[in-house]
Design a protein with these regions (language model features):
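Conserved non-catalytic scaffold segment of RNase H-like nuclease domains
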Residues: 2-111, 271-311, 317
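Acidic two-metal-ion nuclease catalytic site recognized across multiple nuclease folds
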Residues: 182-334
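Short Asp/Glu-rich motifs
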Residues: 88, 174, 255
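Short aromatic/hydrophobic-glycine micro-motifs
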Residues: 74, 122, 160, 241-242, ...
Length: 334
C-alpha cells in the first residue's frame, strides 16, 4: 500500500502580547495562530500527486503583526478574507486523511499545528508520524562551514530554479518537494530515526557504559520527571535496588540533567556500582504539547567521577552566591 506522505508549510500570526492557554491543567504559551497552509501529497520519489492551499481568518491574534506582514507579504485584508480557522483546519485534516505521514522543512510547524487544532476543539492527536526533511537532506549533503539551512539557501545550493516566491505556504512546500526529488527520499525515510532512537543517541553518546535506557511518554508537565516515582526512581545495575539521587543535579545543554546516585547495598563495595552510578535524563517535547523523558544509568569511570565532583562543587558555589545575593537584596529592601 503506498504511503500517504504530506509535505506542508504554515504561516502563522503572533500577538503583541503572549497568549497563555490551559492544556489539561498545564499553562502553555501559544506559539502562533495559523493564517496560511500550503501542502502537497507526494509519492516516495517526491512526485506531486495533489496540492492544498488555504488562507485562514484567525480568532485570537486577529491583527496582523507587522513583522509577519513584512515576511509573508500578507495584509490585514488577506486575514479578514480568510476562511474561518476552525472550518479551514477541519478541511485540511480531512484532505490529509487519517493515515497521513507529515513532513516539513525543520520541526517548527507540527507543534504549531497541534496547538491550533487543540484551541479549535479539533483532534490534536494527529499527526502521529512526521519527518524533519532537513535531517534527511543532511544525511546526503552534510553541512559545510558557512552554509545556511533555510529553504531558500538550500534551493540555491541545489541549483533549483527560483520560479516562485518564498514565504508563501504552498510555494515553499513545492520548493520542498523540488529539494526532495534531488534526494534518495525512500532511503531517507527508511533510515529516519524514531523518537526513541534520537533520544538514545543524545543521552547515551559513545563511549560509555550505559544501562537500562527507558523512555516515558505523554506528559504535559515538564517537571513530572522529578516528581513521578516511576521516572525518578532508577534501579542499580548490579543488585537491582533503588538508587538514591544526589541533591545536586547538573544541567546538560538545554534539556538534559545528570546526577550521581548511590546504591545503599553496593556503596563502599568493590563492585562497579560501589562509588555510585550516574543517573541521566533527556527531555523532549517534539509535538509542542507533550513531554517525553528518556532515562538511563551509566557506570562511571575515574575521570567521570572526578569531573562530577568538580562540577558539583562549582554548582554549590553558584547556589551559595545566589542565596547570598538574594539575602543582601532582601536586607536592602527592609
Amino acid at each position: 500500500m503506498p504511503r500517504n506522505l504530506v509535505l506542508f508549510d504554515l504561516e502563522w500570526n503572533i500577538g503583541y502580547k503572549p497568549y497563555i492557554f490551559n492544556y489539561h491543567g498545564v499553562q502553555q504559551t501559544f506559539r502562533g495562530e495559523i493564517i496560511e497552509i500550503g501542502a502537497v501529497k507526494i509519492d516516495e520519489d517526491a512526485n506531486v500527486l495533489d496540492t492544498f492551499s488555504i488562507h485562514l481568518r484567525p480568532r485570537i491574534f486577529r491583527t496582523l503583526q507587522h513583522h509577519i506582514a513584512k515576511v509573508t507579504g500578507l495584509t490585514q485584508a488577506d486575514l479578514d478574507r480568510g476562511e474561518p480557522i476552525v472550518q479551514g483546519l477541519r478541511r485540511f485534516m480531512q484532505w490529509c486523511g487519517p493515515d497521513a505521514e507529515f513532513a516539513e522543512w525543520g520541526m517548527d510547524d507540527v507543534p504549531v499545528l497541534k496547538q491550533n487544532l487543540f484551541l479549535c476543539n479539533l483532534d490534536e492527536s494527529r499527526p502521529t508520524q512526521w519527518y524533519d526533511l532537513q535531517q534527511i537532506f543532511l544525511r546526503e549533503h552534510p553541512r559545510k562551514e558557512g552554509e545556511g539551512m533555510t529553504l531558500e539557501s538550500v534551493v540555491t545550493r541545489m541549483g533549483i530554479p527560483m520560479e516562485r516566491p518564498f514565504h508563501d505556504a504552498l510555494s515553499d512546500t513545492l520548493y520542498t518537494a523540488d529539494v526532495c526529488r534531488k534526494l534518495d527520499l525512500r532511503a531517507g525515510l527508511a533510515a529516519y530515526p524514531t523518537e526513541e532512537e534520537s533520544l538514545r543517541a543524545s543521552l547515551c553518546p559513545a563511549p560509555g557504559d550505559y544501562r537500562d535506557f527507558r523512555v516515558f511518554r505523554g506528559y504535559v508537565e515538564q517537571s513530572t520527571w522529578r516528581s513521578d516515582p516511576k521516572i525518578i526512581t532508577a534501579s542499580c545495575p548490579v543488585c537491582g535496588g533503588d538508587l538514591q539521587p544526589d541533591d545536586i543535579w547538573l544541567k546538560k545543554g538545554n534539556s538534559g540533567w545528570d546526577t550521581l546516585s548511590a546504591c545503599p547495598a553496593c556503596a563502599g563495595t568493590g563492585n562497579e556500582a560501589g562509588k555510585g552510578v550516574f543517573q541521566r535524563y533527556k527531555l523532549a517535547r517534539r509535538d509542542g504539547l507533550h513531554w517525553s523523558f528518556a532515562r538511563c544509568v551509566q557506570i562511571p569511570d575515574e575521570a567521570g567521577l572526578a569531573r562530577w565532583e568538580r562540577m558539583r562543587a562549582q554548582q554549590i558555589e553558584r547556589m551559595q552566591a545566589r542565596a547570598e545575593k538574594a539575602a543582601a537584596e532582601a536586607d536592602g529592601k527592609a
